[in-house]
From Swiss-Prot:
Biological process terms in GO annotation: mRNA splicing, via spliceosome; RNA splicing
Lineage: Eukaryota, Metazoa, Chordata, Craniata, Vertebrata
Tissue: Highly expressed in pancreas and kidney. Detected at lower levels in heart, brain, placenta, lung, liver, spleen, thymus, prostate, testis, ovary, small intestine, colon and leukocytes.
Positions with biased composition (Basic and acidic residues): 115-130
Official protein name in the record: RNA-binding region-containing protein 3
Gene3D superfamilies in alphabetical order: 3.30.70.330, 6.10.250.610
Known partners and oligomeric status: Component of the U11/U12 snRNPs that are part of the U12-type spliceosome. Found in a complex with m(7)G-capped U12 snRNA. Interacts with PDCD7.
Origin species: Homo sapiens (Human)
Keyword Repeat in record: yes
Clinical note on disease: Pituitary hormone deficiency, combined or isolated, 7: An autosomal recessive deficiency of growth hormone characterized by severe postnatal growth failure, delayed bone age without bone dysplasia, and hypoplasia of the anterior pituitary.
Chain positions with Phosphoserine modification: S21, S108
Segments of this protein annotated with the region Necessary for binding to m(7)G-capped U12 snRNA: 211-380
Biological role stated in the UniProt entry: Participates in pre-mRNA U12-dependent splicing, performed by the minor spliceosome which removes U12-type introns. U12-type introns comprises less than 1% of all non-coding sequences. Binds to the 3'-stem-loop of m(7)G-capped U12 snRNA.
Positions of region (Disordered): 1-26, 106-130, 213-254
Length: 517
């Protein structure tokens, strides 16, 4: 049975194991990196100050420059001086002190003083003690000193432990929990090896050799303790089973050794490299031309045609004039005639131009009554239905001319050419058609069916024309009145800008103009 492997002494700092654990009886120190500013005598005095009996300072050139050998009376004094001198900063230099090796001591023998020789000759007891200590060391470090094997272990021999597995690690953890001294020694070893402390959160599980092992049949369970009196085998069975047992044990040992060697040489798999995403190439122009265009956001809503917004140009030329009179028109004309008759009865005092019935095409034409402006305002306010805004509210809600000049919306304001359609812009987001009907409905006679049909509101809520509206009124007079009164009215915090809508008129050919001239 082999003896357990001896623990290695782990050094701290820059010192080697040989410097901290010298052989017994070693009293000579090798001091390196001595300052060049010091002379040989000063270096000798420095080392003697720390307890050295004899000092040999080497030259300032060569492999061992700025070094010195210091011999101390005993091993304890040498160790004490080493702990004090090692890593000591002196004149900008850091001293490195270690025990002198045997070859260094052979090549550079230290001179011994006469007093030292006398002590050695007078004290033969110390030599006997050292010899006894060396003999004790050989016995202590031998293979089996109880059996007479006092020679040391072969340094080439090494234990071949199986690779770590979950069961082995679980057994080690159980041993740590049951043996407190073992637990403390493991913590000491982790501290010396500069491993992370195990007192924090659980670390990630490293790859185990079990993951790379081929699956094999589990080994048969072994009994923890052999029976006291096992049954004796028969004589006939002994002869036949001896050979098979030897063969099976040899084969099992070989298989186990082969598996252990394979696992020892097996390298863990490398982690799979994550493939980088392919960078998209820039598309060429010819490919972009053939690809179908993505549907724009505006396609989700009905597209307004130019004919829905602007008046269409009329082609120049002779046209046949046709009248398409619907069935509802006679009833509308009857109502208009009844109103005219009522107006005739009221204004019978005013002079009228009488025309012969044979020359009258569509009835009688009467002059406009001359009424004051104040009377018109009263009539308008009285005749307006309750659904529409009053003139006073319009005047209160309008901004002054001075304020219009300061606003950027009214800087380049032009009313445009008069027509029956008006264009309103700078509307707020919350404006709806009913709000515009509430304002511009006061310029429409809702009792007249023709004016009701001609009154049209188109509010643009989306797209490029958002915040604008086109309003069709019965005639140019109503449109001019609406422009004058509603321009600058603040609706939902924003003043409205009212203009006459631009009508697309046909362009004359230059040839026709020249012919006319």
């Amino acid at each position: 049975m082999a003896a357990p492997e001896q623990p290695l002494a782990i050094s701290r700092g820059c010192t080697s194991s040989s410097s901290l654990s010298p052989p017994r009886g070693d009293r000579t120190l090798l001091v390196r990196h001595l300052p060049a500013e010091l002379t040989a005598e000063e270096k000798e005095d420095l080392l003697k100050y720390f307890g050295a009996q004899s000092v040999r300072v080497l030259s300032d050139k060569g492999r061992l420059k700025h070094t010195a050998f210091a011999t101390f009376p005993n091993e304890k004094a040498a160790i004490k001086a080493l702990t004090r001198l090692h890593q000591l900063k002196l004149l900008g230099h850091t001293l490195v002190v270690e025990f002198a090796k045997e070859q260094d001591r052979v090549h550079s023998p230290c001179p011994t003083s006469g007093s030292e020789k006398k002590k050695r000759s007078d004290d033969p007891v110390e030599d006997d003690k050292e010899k006894k200590e060396l003999g004790y060391l050989t016995v202590e470090n031998g293979i089996a000193p109880n059996h007479g094997l006092t020679f040391p272990l072969n340094s080439c021999l090494k234990y071949m432990y199986p690779p770590p597995s979950s069961t082995i690690l679980a057994n080690i953890v159980n041993a740590l929990a049951s043996v407190p001294k073992f637990y403390v020694q493991v913590l000491h070893l982790m501290n010396k090896m500069n491993l992370p402390t195990p007192f924090g959160p659980i670390t990630a599980r490293p790859p185990m050799y079990e993951d790379y092992m081929p699956l094999h049949a589990p080994l048969p369970p072994t009994s923890p303790q052999p029976p006291e009196e096992p049954p004796l085998p028969d004589e006939d069975e002994e002869l036949s089973s001896e050979e098979s047992e030897y063969e099976s044990t040899d084969d099992e040992d070989r298989q186990r050794m082969n598996k252990l060697m394979e696992l020892a040489n097996l390298q863990p798999k490398r982690p799979k490299t994550i493939k980088q995403r392919h960078v998209r190439k820039k598309r060429k122009i010819k490919d972009m031309l053939n690809t179908p265009l993505c549907p724009s956001h505006s396609s989700l809503h009905p597209v307004l045609l130019p004919s829905d917004v602007f008046d269409q140009p009329q082609p120049v030329g002779n046209k046949r004039i046709e009248f398409h009179i619907s069935t509802d028109m006679p009833a509308a004309f009857k109502k208009d005639l009844e109103k005219e008759q009522n107006c005739e009865e009221k204004n019978h005092d005013l002079p009228a131009t009488e025309v012969d019935a044979s020359n009258i095409g569509f009835g009688k034409i009467f002059p406009k009554p001359n009424l004051d402006i104040t009377e018109e305002i009263k009539e308008d306010s009285d005749e307006m239905p309750s659904e529409c805004i009053s003139r006073r509210e319009l005047e209160k809600g309008r901004i002054s001319r001075e304020e219009m000049e300061t606003l950027s919306v009214f800087r380049s304001y032009e009313p445009g050419e008069p027509n029956c359609r008006i264009y309103v812009k700078n509307l707020a987001k919350h404006v709806q058609e009913k709000d515009l009907k509430y304002i511009f409905g006061r310029y429409v006679d809702f009792s007249s069916e023709t004016q009701r049909i001609m009154f049209d509101i188109r509010l643009m809520k989306e797209g490029r024309m958002k915040g604008q509206a086109f309003i069709g009124l019965p005639n140019e007079k109503a449109a001019a009145k609406a422009l004058k009164e509603a321009n600058g009215y603040v609706l939902f915090g924003k003043p409205m800008v009212v203009q006459f809508a631009r009508s697309a008129r046909p362009k004359q050919d230059p040839k026709e103009g020249k012919r006319k001239c």
